[in-house]
């Protein structure tokens, strides 16, 4: 089976990260020839080892990476996956419609836990002017969706990393014995309030951070208001394959976007989701919908989880108080996060579920 994946990079690294992870799974785990068409190879190169964005097309880890424009003169593969509703080149769409047999055309959508997703998952959508269907495929956290991307060796790698955790944190001059929080959020997050909460609590803590605007804000706050109880460990940007180690090394996570949101859930660690802000507070509705899904798994600690997440994204509650409760109930949330991960694993990997769906349409 041959596969084309189209990636229109719009927001930071999230779009590229999701597409690269899917392409890698299809290539490395299933052995399928995969072409990834992308409009911003420069962004992809920052999270993909061995990719020179100036030398396209190229083969990286078994995946053929092409400039988006290459599709205009290419023939479709047996499966064509457009991600997040990106519009394919018109000439390529015509080739899909004319091919015999027609390729299976998939629109891989954004992850959402909202109720309506279950009713739209796997539905066909006729092209407005061509005689061809494409199918909506939704990642999700219920049995009636496509699940999440889970590599076959993910948990083996996490288990192996446990013995290297201390050395990993020490490489950032952090004390492995201290409570460690990984912070990967948008610059608009309530970082001043968070820093204030850490100072007021007074207990020693490690902050593990990737380089970026949010890290610069926290560093400036530290310069203005030094605090002996807060230790910083700042990392340069790393390949996607190394990102999980930062989650595994931490006790609690603050993450953003979609790909890191999924990886946080699969790490089995309590997390705060800095969801991408949208107009009319649409993002808050998405956050609350996700909260309803995990509520049965978090039980007694759920109110603490949702209050902290709403505080982070809406600034409608006292963050200092929420953080104190978060730290107090961390043991309960750790157990809940692992139960939630077990549930996600039971849904199967998105890549496997997508392949099963494709085979049912051939």
Stretches with model-predicted labels:
Residues 13, 20-24, 237-286:
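A donor-sugar binding/catalytic signature common to diverse glycosyltransferases
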Residues 287-299:
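Conserved phosphoryl-transfer catalytic core
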Residues 100-104, 203, 269:
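A short helix->loop->beta-strand "cap" motif at the edges of active sites that frequently abuts
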Residues 167, 174-244:
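Donor-nucleotide binding loops and adjacent catalytic segments primarily
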Residues 6-31, 35-131, 212:
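Active-site and donor-binding regions of nucleotide-sugar-utilizing enzymes
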Residues 296-362:
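C-terminal amphipathic helix plus adjacent low-complexity
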Residues 1-4:
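Extreme N-terminal starter segment of soluble prokaryotic enzymes
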Residues 109-192:
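A nucleotide-sugar donor-handling region in carbohydrate enzymes
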């Amino acid at each position: 089976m041959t596969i084309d994946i189209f990636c229109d990079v719009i927001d930071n690294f999230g779009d590229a990260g999701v597409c690269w992870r899917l392409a890698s799974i299809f290539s490395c785990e299933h052995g399928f020839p995969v072409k990834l068409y992308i409009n911003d190879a420069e962004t992809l190169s920052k999270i993909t080892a061995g990719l020179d964005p100036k030398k396209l097309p190229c083969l990286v880890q078994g995946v053929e990476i092409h400039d988006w424009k290459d599709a205009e003169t290419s023939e479709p593969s047996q499966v064509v996956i457009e991600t997040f509703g990106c519009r394919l080149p018109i000439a390529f769409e015509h080739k899909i419609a004319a091919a015999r047999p027609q390729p299976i055309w998939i629109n891989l959508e954004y992850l959402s836990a909202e109720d309506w997703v279950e009713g739209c998952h796997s539905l066909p959508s006729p092209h407005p002017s061509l005689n061809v269907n494409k199918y909506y495929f939704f990642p999700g956290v219920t049995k009636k969706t496509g699940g999440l991307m889970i590599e076959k060796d993910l948990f083996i790698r996490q288990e192996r990393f446990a013995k290297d955790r201390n050395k990993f944190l020490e490489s950032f001059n952090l004390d492995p014995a201290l409570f460690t929080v990984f912070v990967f959020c948008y610059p608009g997050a309530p970082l001043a309030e968070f820093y204030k909460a850490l100072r007021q609590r007074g207990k020693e803590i490690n902050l593990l951070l990737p380089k970026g605007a949010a890290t610069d804000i926290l560093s400036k706050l530290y310069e203005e208001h030094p605090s002996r109880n807060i230790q910083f460990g700042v990392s340069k940007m790393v390949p996607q394959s190394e990102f999980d180690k930062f989650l595994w090394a931490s006790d609690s996570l603050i993450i953003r976007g979609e790909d890191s949101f999924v990886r946080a859930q699969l790490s089995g660690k309590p997390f705060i989701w800095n969801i991408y802000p949208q107009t009319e507070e649409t993002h808050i509705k998405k956050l609350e919908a996700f909260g309803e899904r995990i509520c049965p798994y978090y039980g007694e600690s759920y109110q603490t989880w949702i209050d902290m997440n709403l505080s982070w994204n809406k600034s409608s509650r006292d963050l200092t108080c929420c953080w104190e409760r978060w730290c107090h109930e961390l043991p309960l949330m750790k157990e809940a996060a692992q139960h939630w991960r077990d549930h996600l694993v039971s849904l199967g990997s998105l890549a496997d579920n997508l392949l099963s769906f494709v085979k049912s349409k051939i």
